[in-house]
């Protein structure tokens, strides 16, 4: 059936900020879909609150609204734009929930807007636990016995009838939020109570636990003519019981018989047909390893994390095709863009194995609860492709960037057997490494399979890897063993370790004996048809399929898996850099390992290498492609860290040179440069041990800011107020980088701001200055940033511009750089300089309309700013106010403290823009889900050093009609200044403490600051946790609370007695 002509204008809802459970895969899907709809001639209107994505670029849709995804704003845009149809299935859970809300409020009917892709009834049937159960019963598909409950008592009664363990799943929440496995009544009570609060419809499903079954997923597509196909099936290495987003996954499934595959395939296709979904859908099933029994676990009636993985694993572009199906095209009329010759009706066939491993944030959150369960915790993932399981698994391990280059963490060799087995049984994020260690200690695959329910097939592969390690150890320099190791994915570094030599010598030996990888094409059809996609992976085998072209090429290194501190912003810069390379007439080659992102979409670059970002893997590509040079400044710290080894190997680094990168990163060289350029910085010193640090701090005076050099996202960075805390920091945190000393700086409490600049070596363009709302001490990635600055004097802005120019020229910067300043008493100090693209590039590019990464790339390739039409200096500022606000994922991470400090904790960002600061702030708060009603109660629990300031805020809250509550000390201080606050009890004062007030819904906001001593704050942590769990707005910085007050004041009328 040809595409529909009765609709012209389509609105697409994006997925909003990146949070755990809903990451960059939706940026990829949404970008694909919008372009796909435009290609068919429709007018596309996009709404998304996330500035960090390619999806919210002007070129992606005809009209792009970066506005909050809330009923209020989406309705406004619908009324203004009057689209004919709405496509909600590409915006993750956010998009689906928004569509439901619009429909339930009658907005879609009122405006005559039709839903495309998935019918509302299908969303309901898949998401509402009760309807889903009914549908499965009608289709005679087995599901675990379960009951819908609306109260804790009902849950306990049902569990008594089926027996523990049971699983709790709240309705309409994302990534398993609020759910969990319960082994007894106490756990059930706790998890259900929390789950009911988090479910927008206060219902939970209590179901029999089928933990230990194999978890299999099918990615299916269907069109309006009822054609349906399986794009790909995937098997979790971890059995049921661990969220699929936190599981290691292989595609295609490895351990099912043909009969089992057909059985689950039929089930998946019958489900998508029953739901009448037009587009993509993901079905998760549990298969009993000992019989042919299976259960349907859940269905996602939309494009999901797994579909991004399936798209990259097979090359079959699910989101692109889902958009075409939504407007009436059928699978047998759409050409598969990968082959360019076959139709989309052909099911992909794979002649390789794909491994996906999640990337967790526990390197940043050492206190976080690492046990894995039904609630997702990973921030990102890596994917690797190989010709066997060993190869793809080991390539994925070294893609993770957690300091491992093999399936082993050397420290685990020291762990006792008891601890080892406990970690093998109770899965944490690093279980693979514990299981591998158990095999090295001689536990048999049978024993481990019994303990973990991991299929013995995979454990045999781990055993095979260990056997190769032993062979290597026994036969140093043996070429035959070397070949076997390389066929199974071993890195040069691991081989060197086992041979007692260097990676470099192993590489030389390989090159001399022509043991080099070949590159194979990902073509969706196992090479049955000719394919035109330039999408490759390495393997050691015959016949290289990646042919070097005659055109000069430039290689861009991506930023690897998404983690806190290095998010989708860097992918954004990578994609823009590629556009500029192509515009300059070169062939653009991308190398990256992240399946969720736009940069690894084969249609973005001229060639894509899906490979780990390690020196060995990058050099192999360079040896084959012989590019003009490599661009490292858009791939975050991942790419910057490769600059030095690549340069040493004779590779041309384009842009700022390695010596100059070092001058910005190395403390002593940087100080030297600032002295020469006559630019002030807070006094500081370097220390390599505890005594030196204590000495330095005494000399500078407390408070001091301590941090290791060469890290991204403020890892292991702290503000320390006294010697005792400093010594404990030196003992626990310095392991962050032993070769690099620790920096001890005077901590200046002032106004913080940052600048991104672009330099051609002679002139410097400064697109804008961003002022932080939170004063210095909160990591820049966790601060709200305002552009243009609202409180900086003209003189300060001129000084900032002047210092920026001096630094860019003085450090021989070519391309992008980011500088952070702190201002105190009108004096400007430089805190740090990053000679690369930073996480503010997408935001600033959007609000100034300067495509910064593209401009920087053109300069790197030899053009000048004046040739591109830009002036030297500060760019004229926008007349509107724009705010970038952070978004956190604390609900997913138990035991992680939500207190903001110099270590970054946010996973994503939103943007609010309007004519005034207050309006822009309102939008930013709404978009980041910080919604405050116009009246209610606010509770203050404030450290002594901030009580003065808090008093002023409390008075203003009172003036607009808020009730003020406070903890004992704060209440006494307020009272002595004539403000009566209702006192709340200490933690543990049964019904009178803050957590119990929060549970009863009597508190609308919490303002909690922490004093100089970090140690005595367990009460504060409980208070903050209760706010997070119940979705009560929490402010740990008074500046943020002040910004929220500005919004509330601007929205309320002042009532004064005469």
Swiss-Prot record:
Pathway: Amino-acid biosynthesis; L-arginine biosynthesis; carbamoyl phosphate from bicarbonate: step 1/1; Pyrimidine metabolism; UMP biosynthesis via de novo pathway; (S)-dihydroorotate from bicarbonate: step 1/3
Name of the protein this chain belongs to: Carbamoyl phosphate synthase large chain
Gene that encodes the chain: carB
Protein family according to the UniProt entry: Belongs to the CarB family.
Annotated cofactor note: Binds 4 Mg(2+) or Mn(2+) ions per subunit.
InterPro entries referenced in this protein's UniProt entry, alphabetically: ATP-grasp, ATP_grasp_subdomain_1, CarbamoylP_synth_lsu, CarbamoylP_synth_lsu_oligo, CarbamoylP_synth_lsu_oligo_sf, CbamoylP_synth_lsu-like_ATP-bd, CbamoylP_synth_lsu_CPSase_dom, MGS-like_dom
Record region (Carboxyphosphate synthetic domain): 1-401
Residues the entry annotates as binding Mg(2+) 4: 832, 834
Residue segments, region Allosteric domain: 930-1058
Region (Oligomerization domain) residue spans: 402-546
Residue numbers binding ATP 1: 129, 169, 175-176, 208, 210, 215, 241-243, 284, 298
Residues reported to bind Mg(2+) 3: 820, 832
Region of interest called Carbamoyl phosphate synthetic domain, as start-end residue ranges on this chain: 547-929
MF terms in GO: ATP binding; carbamoyl-phosphate synthase (ammonia) activity; carbamoyl-phosphate synthase (glutamine-hydrolyzing) activity; metal ion binding
